[in-house]
Amino acid sequence: MKKKISLLTISIFDNILSSRISNIDKRGPTMAREKFSTLTEQMFYILLCLREEGCGMDVMTRVNELTGGRVAVGPGTLYNLLEQFLAAGYIVETRAEGRRRSYQLTAEGKTLLQNEVERLQAQVRDYEKLFER
């Protein structure tokens, strides 16, 4: 038996999600930086693809092409993360034409990516110590 989801349920969920997203700014840059100390695969590729200026559609296309479809970023996830990256100072909005906005990685965003690469390389070294004997 399928359960029906009411508009009220969706509205309540939307309000909870919106309040959590808006709290990002209220917690300040320190909390945002802590949140991004370890990146998810989607976060990593979104930032990587913003090395060059691009809008949301550009980013989704670049991630798909770069990973051969292995990593998918949906619009909801993408725009949520873009807002968080903007608030944390990892990307900057470069253009706005109607509803279409373009973004680019900042120096702080490049540092975040480099730190993530170093973290991943350390994991590979640890793996090799144990399994490549």
Per-region residue spans from a language model:
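Basic, amphipathic "hinge/linker" alpha-helix immediately C-terminal to the N-terminal HTH DNA-binding motif
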Residues: 98-117
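Short, intrinsically disordered or compositionally biased N-terminal tails of bacterial proteins
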Residues: 1-34
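Short, hydrophobic-biased segments on the C-terminal half of alpha helices
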Residues: 79-84
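Amphipathic alpha-helical dimerization/coiled-coil segments
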Residues: 20, 114-133
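N-terminal helix-turn-helix DNA-binding core of bacterial DNA-binding proteins
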Residues: 33-77
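Beta-hairpin "wing" of winged helix-turn-helix
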Residues: 86-98, 104
